[in-house]
Amino acid sequence: MNEIQKYIAANEPQIMEDLFSLIRIPSISALPEHHDDMLACAERWAQLLLEAGVDEALVMPSQGNPIVFAQKIVDPDAKTVLVYAHYDVMPAEPLELWKSQPFEPEIRDGYIWARGADDDKGQSFIQVKAFEYLLKNGLLRNNVKFIFEGEEEIGSPSLEAFCEEHKELLKADVILVSDT
């Protein structure tokens, strides 16, 4: 077992609970009745990013749903990676097509089944955990910034204005897009 596998094995219960805590939030951007869920999901992401070791994690207003921004600056002269992801999900209907509740994660045949487990909470969660591993093991050589939006599933109507307004904050050498 290599060092990464050991880290995952040692932390698996907490890793799974943290991921499931995100998936359980029905952050459906297309439905206005989920406005509070959108904020709850953004706040949960900020908390998880802080726990992973970022210097700051902010839930920032936009013209629509909040945007989560976080960063870890290891060296002002180092290159910066900006990780983009989204925390909103599509509606789960029709519910009768689900074999389990869409916002109650279930493991079947080694896979997590739930709305958002893949697109995009699962993918972005893996990026954050990789960052955490690198940081905790003294392997992080680049600055890392995260931007997680809450409107990708409805066309990202607020993202362009947010990026324009905060272009200095979001400045990076490379962007890693975490989305299917």
Describe the predicted segments one by one.
Residues 141-180:
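Histidine/acidic-residue-rich, glycine-tolerant segments that coordinate divalent metal ions
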Residues 17, 52, 139-142, 170:
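Structured loop/turn residues at beta-strand edges in well-structured enzyme cores
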Residues 10, 51, 136-137, 164-168:
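Secondary-structure boundary motif
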Residues 34, 94, 123, 158-159:
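Residues at alpha-helix caps and immediate loop-helix transition turns in enzyme cores, especially N-
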